[in-house]
Amino acid sequence: GSLAFDLSTADRSDRLNAYASFQNTARKSYYGSHQDPAAYGTTHDLTLAAGVQYVHAFSRLLFMPSELTLGAEYNYDDLADRSLGYHTRTEQTVHVGGFYFQNEWKNRRWSLLLGGRLDKHNLVKGAIFSPRVNVRFNPSESVNLRASYAGGYRAPQAFDEDMHIAIVGGERVRIRLAEGLREERSHSVSCSADLYR
């Protein structure tokens, strides 16, 4: 289920959004295709997400009209997966709290977006900062040029959907996270040119 709350001023220069959602999965599964009588198990996965976002539109900030976005988000995931026939279990609880910001300056010819997100994941030491930058330039009405950069990460955690793929193929799988794993980092760069006729 989910809930959302939206509030804005009459001119829409200030907007506030708050949201919360949850999902509860309780599943009994058999993976053996009548080949392995021990290939059965249970999964319980409770996922919660909640956040708030505030947006303010400036008629001019420094050099151009802009829109500032500030927000905070919290995610919780509690996973218990048991392969009863093999006497194995994976239990994991994840807490991720994050704050993000971005400001986008925009007019008919240019847009510049600068932003970032700071996350604290309970399975990772320290906070993780993920920046983003996007530039758009329209030298004419028929040409659109864009360039962007975004950083990201993936924490070392077991994912419910990954656990059962190999089991369906007849393999016995036991997932255990190694000590001292660090987050994976990603860097995405893109450039594009569009010509409209």
Q: What does each model-found stretch correspond to?
A:
Residues K106-R108, F137-S142:
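Secondary-structure transition/capping motifs at alpha-helix termini
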Residues G1-T9, N138, N144, S148-R197:
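Outer-membrane beta-barrel signature, preferentially recognizing the C-terminal barrel domain
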Residues S2-K125:
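Face-selective signature of the C-terminal outer-membrane beta-barrel domain
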